[in-house]
């Protein structure tokens, strides 16, 4: 039987980072993953360049960029290991990077630079600390015993493992083609943890074939919009780019909104957020003889202008021949466009999974669950960040908090 201090289940961003930090605290760590490759989500993120953090994260106010039943749970970990801490590590390894948009940091060359950095960190154990990886290796079962001392025994496809502590870093259900499974949720339920129902997040929205028929020909077009969902005094809104697809909507604005969207509720879009369109059109009647489609093409892609004006006969006239009321209706349709999605593209295209292990059953200081010696970190926990590097920073911060807690518990000074 293989004996280690810590067994980490999952060789993704959180699992690898936790392993490296723990080994550098003198712990012997075994990382296992049923998938043959490490950190595949890092590899494919950011168009292959990995949006590895966001420099504008305010760790004191995680509710501004994270969601979950209790987003403030993340404050402790995010405050103790900040975006600036991870940036310093990236710089230490000589990895060139750049800011692309709204604090989002990307590797200049390739996400592989970041993966190689994490693997080098795993090799930099101190005080006898080591990291061993078993891949591909499936977990068959996990049991706990408190005699003669508290420990776990894992049955795996490569044999038995005895560990003083277990860290579940197995991620969510997003992108199953790179190995996502519900293993973390099953382990949580086995040991009595509560769950917040998982759902796809940062995911394209879809519409019924009938509802989307007028817009299907716009697939591939992108434009900046203001997008909103929710009711009451504080609806959720984002000003980002939107992308038309064959089945619905994608792009940063849509991915952001999708994390908050509730089934059966409408979304509202303003396709010209920086323009008083009705006033502009009515004022232009005196000086322009263009038809409405050509007029709108000054601010919108011509395919959008053509598709929109084709919806009603009164919008297919020249600008001077269109009534003020019809122009107002056209402006409203573009600047207060309300549609109810039929669903999402699901886990296959979701960047992350919302929901997960209920944070009420975890320590915000250590990530340890109410089951002694069992920890949960990263995406498997009910903390979900915005698009733009927030979810990776949660992975680094929760992993760091966990690794430091493991060292304090298993290698006390």
Region annotations inferred by a language model:
Residues 4-31, 402-407:
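N-terminal Rossmann-like FAD-binding beta1-loop-alpha1 element of flavoenzymes
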Residues 125-139:
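A conserved beta-strand/loop element that lines the FAD pocket in flavoprotein oxidoreductases
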